[in-house]
Design a protein with these regions (language model features):
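Conserved helicase RecA-like core
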Residues: 1-331
Length: 331
């Protein structure tokens, strides 16, 4: 909410914000207000919101649906992994706000379906995740296509050097805002480490899942291959689960997310990149089956529980080879 007054003045914003902190409202509401005030609106795109994954693009689009419900502001969303025809038709009709993932945006620009000459507001969301997913080159290719005179709103949960360099080139005297959840990660999450042999991790997971019957559980795996293996192991133990990772089709990921959110399945196995789209307020338990290589990723992972003031539990399985990773996180 702190970002809204600054964004309404048209200033550039640099927001250090995690997922689940209400930052969509921080950029969407001011943009909708600015566009609603325009007298002569043509079909051109006036606001571009760039986000790393289809899941996030859809979530942002749903929020804009709510905020723009009683306005004349039109918006649309584009992402890869689906036929482009419906998206092209939507663009022909004209949208004021376009929510997009980088690959599909550049693709449709190269085909001549998208022009960004009239963009007044540019939002770069989850910039650090864009970096993790290798989209930074796409973004650098995109920037020269945007008008020099525009408002830029830049959000990132962490600020590594590459991101800081990008903000320096992109933002003009930005208002800096740290949007933190009401309580810090540590306050609402009980964290426990189990030191366990690598080959015993499956047994430990099955035993914990039996004890937490009825609870939704998100399990993190470092690799896609291991995520699929965990699903097979749990299935043999009579526990239903689904995996989401980059090798799954967009539709498979979307349907697995829906099943998890609605409680059709209670156990979701995810890799870090795929999990960025999971936004569930009441998730009581997160399990790190494998430790992440980077301490920030651990914070992202356990931040999936203990949301919105609810308490949560994060369990971490640590094998002999992973001891150093635990001490890095503890620092």
């Amino acid at each position: 909410v702190k970002a809204i007054p600054a964004a309404l003045t048209g200033k550039d914003i640099l927001g250090c914000a995690q997922t689940g902190t209400g930052k969509t409202a921080a950029f969407a509401i001011p943009i909708i207000q600015h566009l609603q005030a325009l007298k002569n609106r043509d079909k051109s795109i006036k606001a571009l919101i760039l986000t790393p994954t289809r899941e996030l693009a859809l979530q942002i689009s749903e929020c804009i649906d709510d905020y723009a419900k009683y306005t004349q502001v039109r918006h649309g969303v584009i992402f890869g992994g689906v036929n482009q025809r419906a998206q092209v038709n939507m663009l022909h009709k004209g949208v004021d706000i376009l929510v997009a993932t980088p690959g599909r945006l550049l693709d449709l620009m190269n085909q001549g379906y998208i022009h960004l000459d009239n963009v007044r507001h540019f939002v770069l969301d989850e910039a650090d995740r864009m970096l993790d997913m290798g989209f930074i080159h796409d973004i650098k290719r995109l920037l020269p296509k945007l008008p020099k005179e525009k408002q830029t709103l830049f959000f990132s949960a962490t600020m590594p050097d590459t991101i800081i360099a990008l903000t320096n080139s992109l933002l003009k005297q930005p208002v800096k805002i740290a949007i933190t959840p009401k309580s810090s990660t540590v306050d609402t999450i009980e964290q426990t480490v189990y030191f366990v042999e690598k080959k015993e991790k499956s047994k430990l997971l099955i035993s914990i899942l039996h004890k937490t019957e009825g609870q939704s559980v998100l399990v993190f795996s470092r690799t896609k291959h291991n995520a699929d293996r965990i699903v097979r192991v749990l299935s043999k133990a009579g526990i239903g689960s689904q995996a989401i990772h980059g090798n799954k089709s967009q539709n498979a990921r979307q349907s697995a997310l829906e099943n998890f959110k609605t409680g059709k399945i209670r156990v979701m196995i995810a890799t870090d990149i795929a999990a960025r789209g999971i936004d569930i307020n009441e998730l009581p338990l997160v399990i790190n089956y494998d430790l992440p290589d980077v301490p920030e990723t651990y914070v992202h992972r356990i931040g999936r529980t203990g949301r919105a003031g609810n308490s949560g539990t994060a369990l971490t399985f640590c094998s002999q080879e992973e001891r150093k990773l635990v001490s890095d996180i503890q620092k």
